[in-house]
Amino acid sequence: MAELPVGLKTAHRILVEGRDVSTAILSRLIRLSVRDASGQAADTAEIELDDRGGSIVFPRAGVSIEIRLADARGRGLVFAGKVDSARSRGDRSGGRILTISAKGADVMGRAKQLQERHFDDVTIGEALRIAGAAAGIEEVRVDPDLAQISRTYLALEGESFLAFGQRLAREVGATFKVVGSRALLVKRNAGTTASGRPMGTVPAVAGDNLFSWDIAPYVGRPRHSRATARHYDPDQARHQQSSVDLDDDSTDAELIVRYGAADGAAAQDQAAASAAEVERAGGSGSVTIDGDLRAKPGALCEVRGARPGIDGDYLIDAVEHSLDRTSALTTRLDLGLPQGTAGQDARRSA
């Protein structure tokens, strides 16, 4: 196993088409990063290499790549996908740099192909599995509660499987992601995996593993007291509303979902999903900690020792693992949904 040179202290392993190239690129590696965000349909990875003399063989699009990194607890797989692009840049005095970008979803495959199909009286889980099979997806895993949500009618009208999954995720308050030949639909803000298991908590402790923080536990603009969606009721010949109240007495503004739902059940799901997004956006920020491969979008981050009003629990919205020539593995966490003592300072005002 290759050990990174001075500054790159993390044991790493990079496989291209199943071949270990860690040692071959060791002296050329400038920076490596892997990003996993709940709002994007696929994980991304980027490898930046010193391409002096143009000696590195230019990578082909669609080549498979795996990246394994190690933290204090051991090594783990952090990315599996395919090369999406390769970019060369250089100038007269700065040398040459080759940047290889990869995505967890096969963007060359049928997942991006537009489909024309519809479903009558179908569950979300069943609709995703059928559309996924047509897109070459071998396995679709859906949170058990989400899988049972039924719709009287669903359609893909010139819509890809990727777009279909993201649309359903927005409508039911979920996160959709494609990883290789698998697709996942999990609840947002629930802190659970697609099978319903708890994701755990990642600590960020000042004086221990916390490098830096930039957090605003209270953001006023996204806050609302209620989320409301509507649908047209043909029996009553008028629009009906479905609402979800939010536990926030700092505002009396109501969030109105812009587009109407197909029926009452869909409207209730849209209102609940919008309420979850409001809660998530009520605070925001980021922390950078020692490399921690346990961090996943949807898990909790417990910030301690920063200061009163900042310390507390936050939901992890995105994770980026990175290392370069000047530092060992670090993990950046984008945060939202402040909880517990976040935003509270019990000290008396001066």
Explain the meaning of each model-derived region:
Residues 28, 32-57, 208-350:
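An acidic/polar, Gly/Ser/Thr-rich interaction patch typically located in mid-to-C-terminal regions
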Residues 75, 90-94, 177, 184, ...:
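Short glycine/serine/proline-enriched coil/turn segments at secondary-structure junctions
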Residues 45-48, 102, 115-141, 155-179, ...:
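Amphipathic, non-transmembrane alpha-helical segments in extracytoplasmic/periplasmic proteins
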Residues 1-109:
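Assembly/oligomerization scaffold segments
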Residues 20-28, 77-82, 113, 195-208, ...:
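Short amphipathic beta-strand/extended segments with alternating polar/hydrophobic composition
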Residues 89-90, 173-175, 214-219:
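A generic local secondary-structure boundary/capping motif
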Residues 81-89, 190, 314-326:
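Short, compositionally biased
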Residues 2, 97-106, 141-211:
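Short beta-strand-centered interaction patches in the first periplasmic/extracellular domains
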